[in-house]
């Protein structure tokens, strides 16, 4: 049985549990304990603090973990990245008081920077030849300049609203982060087989994101032009209709280009366009 370490609460917890649920892996969270076994898949979930997950996976206490890339890079544990999951996105940035003009990275020379991510910050400063003092604190990093604890901060930024409320401005994006599926490097062959099934399900869910299944009635004399517009997976499905001169076209569209393509299809005479969500896609 695979053991996967998951953040115990917060946005990463919610999005992780949603992914497992969409992969038809049932985990009860109504009476949550430290370790919960799935009722329909050979996996158990270990609920932890996010900063404990990299070490837990590297040492083999858990086989897998879902953790923010920022925590994984900060801890520098010997585990492998299996899959980028594309959610819980944020960035780690340097920020400074908004009323001070920012001339470039050289401004940080001799300054004190407050952060909960000293390893990532130290590596960045060293790479860029900046000599600054790192002040490590946990929580409420953004208040440090306002109370005189530091000149600047290095912290997670999502929307930037927390910076604004503390009269700070983001001046350097050091790294972009998202949720990662990480794994122990010494999993048994039996566990690797379970992992393959888990990845198969996760990939089906992730591939379907931002995709729509589209059905339309199309005039046969415009069929070649309509097919040329469609950026489907391989080629659309074409089915004859009872009405002479018409056929039904089924395809998959990327939501980012949906309205652009639909407009072209209507211009070519497509009618009765039906759009459906896709839960999973196996390619």
Curated annotation (Swiss-Prot):
Q: How is its activity regulated?
A: Feedback inhibited by histidine.
Q: Which reaction does it catalyse?
A: 1-(5-phospho-beta-D-ribosyl)-ATP + diphosphate = 5-phospho-alpha-D-ribose 1-diphosphate + ATP
Q: Name the Gene Ontology biological process terms.
A: L-histidine biosynthetic process
Identify the main location: cytoplasm
| Cited SUPFAM superfamilies | GlnB-like, Periplasmic binding protein-like II
Q: Which Gene3D superfamilies match?
A: 3.30.70.120, Periplasmic binding protein-like II
Decide whether keyword Metal-binding is in the record: yes
Required cofactor(s): Mg(2+)
Pathway annotation: Amino-acid biosynthesis; L-histidine biosynthesis; L-histidine from 5-phospho-alpha-D-ribose 1-diphosphate: step 1/9
- EC number of this enzyme: 2.4.2.17
Where in the cell is the protein located? Cytoplasm
Keyword Calcium (UniProt): no
Q: Name the enzyme's class.
A: transferase
Query: Which cysteine pairs make disulfide bonds?
Result: none
Q: What GO terms fall under cellular component here?
A: cytoplasm
**Could you tell me the superkingdom of the organism this chain comes from?**
Bacteria
Q: What keywords sit in the KW lines?
A: Amino-acid biosynthesis, ATP-binding, Cytoplasm, Glycosyltransferase, Histidine biosynthesis, Magnesium, Metal-binding, Nucleotide-binding, Transferase
**Gene Ontology MF term list:** ATP binding; ATP phosphoribosyltransferase activity; magnesium ion binding
Sum up the protein's function in the record's words.
Answer: Catalyzes the condensation of ATP and 5-phosphoribose 1-diphosphate to form N'-(5'-phosphoribosyl)-ATP (PR-ATP). Has a crucial role in the pathway because the rate of histidine biosynthesis seems to be controlled primarily by regulation of HisG enzymatic activity.
Q: Report the sequence similarity comment from the record.
A: Belongs to the ATP phosphoribosyltransferase family. Long subfamily.
Q: What is this protein called?
A: ATP phosphoribosyltransferase
**Which organism is the protein's source?**
Bacteroides thetaiotaomicron (strain ATCC 29148 / DSM 2079 / JCM 5827 / CCUG 10774 / NCTC 10582 / VPI-5482 / E50)
State the taxonomy lineage.
Bacteria, Pseudomonadati, Bacteroidota, Bacteroidia, Bacteroidales
């Amino acid at each position: 049985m695979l053991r996967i370490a998951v953040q115990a609460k917060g946005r990463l917890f919610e999005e992780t549990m949603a992914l497992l649920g969409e992969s038809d892996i049932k985990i009860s969270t109504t009476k949550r304990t430290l370790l919960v076994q799935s009722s329909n898949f050979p996996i158990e979930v270990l609920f932890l603090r996010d900063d404990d997950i990299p070490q837990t996976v590297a040492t083999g206490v858990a086989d897998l973990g879902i953790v923010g890339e920022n925590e994984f890079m900060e801890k520098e544990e010997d585990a492998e990245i299996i899959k980028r999951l594309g959610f819980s996105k944020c960035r780690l940035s340097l920020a400074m008081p908004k009323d001070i003009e920012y001339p470039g990275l050289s401004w940080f020379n001799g300054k004190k920077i407050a952060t909960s991510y000293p390893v990532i910050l130290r590596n960045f400063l060293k790479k860029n030849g900046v000599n600054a003092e790192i002040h490590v604190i946990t929580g409420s990093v953004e208040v440090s300049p306002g109370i005189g604890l530091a000149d600047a901060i290095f912290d997670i930024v999502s929307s930037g609203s927390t910076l604004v409320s503390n009269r700070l401005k983001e001046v350097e994006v050091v790294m972009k982060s998202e949720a990662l599926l990480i794994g122990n490097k010494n999993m048994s062959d039996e566990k690797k087989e379970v992992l393959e099934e888990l990845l198969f399900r996760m990939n089906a869910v992730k591939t379907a994101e931002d995709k729509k299944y589209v059905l339309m009635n199309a005039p046969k004399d415009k069929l070649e032009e309509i097919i040329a517009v469609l950026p489907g997976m391989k080629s659309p499905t074409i089915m004859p209709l009872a009405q002479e001169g018409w056929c039904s076209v089924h395809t998959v569209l990327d939501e980012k280009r949906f309205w652009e393509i639909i407009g072209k299809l209507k211009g070519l005479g497509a009618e009765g366009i039906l759009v459906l969500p896709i839960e999973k896609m196996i390619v």
